[in-house]
Design a protein with these regions (language model features):
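Acidic, PIN/NYN-like endoribonuclease modules and their adjacent C-terminal/linker elements
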Residues: 1, 100, 104-127
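Short, well-structured N-terminal submotif of metal-dependent ribonuclease cores
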Residues: 1-35, 45-58
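Histidine- and aromatic-rich ligand-binding microenvironments
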Residues: 5, 36, 92-93, 114
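A generic structural signal for short hydrophobic patches within well-formed alpha-helices
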Residues: 9-10, 40-43, 117
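Active-site neighborhoods of divalent-metal-dependent phosphate/nucleic-acid chemistry enzymes
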Residues: 19, 64-113
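Conserved beta-strand segments of alpha/beta enzyme cores
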Residues: 32, 64, 125-127
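Short, hinge-like loop/turn segments at secondary-structure boundaries
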Residues: 50-54, 84, 127
Length: 127
């Protein structure tokens, strides 16, 4: 299962051709994809035009919806944040710590274009 971060979805809906959006285009037809509940909120709230909002909702309805949080993930996310901080790395957004931790706990790969996740890949085993 591959969870797709908002950093990729935003570029995708803007029509930006990046390595990640090109991969997403291929994966939409061939792989089981997931979206986190808070990522869904973040993406949908950005649409101004109702038609585009509805089109995005239909696309997201075909994906697995993953609850990102919960007590176990929250505690493990705090541990992961602290591990990185001890290495001199500060993650800019708490939500990124939660997303990365959910992926690691659930064995998901994360498709992203956000440097905050690079430290999770390098030091904590995020795929």
């Amino acid at each position: 299962m591959i969870l797709v971060d908002s950093s990729v979805w935003i570029d995708y809906f803007r029509g930006s051709a990046t390595k990640q959006t090109q991969r997403l285009d291929l994966l939409l037809d061939t792989e089981a994809l997931a979206i986190g509940d808070l990522i869904l909120t973040e993406i949908l709230q950005g649409f101004v035009i109702d038609r585009e909002f509805d089109e995005a909702r239909r696309l997201f309805a075909s994906l697995k919806l993953v609850a990102l949080g919960g007590e176990d993930v929250a505690i493990e996310a705090a541990r992961n944040f602290r591990k990185l901080r001890k290495l001199g790395i500060t993650v800019r957004q708490t939500i990124d710590t939660v997303i990365a931790t959910r992926c690691m706990v659930s064995g998901y790969e994360l498709l992203h274009d956000d440097r905050d996740f690079d430290s999770f890949e390098k030091h904590l085993g995020l795929r």
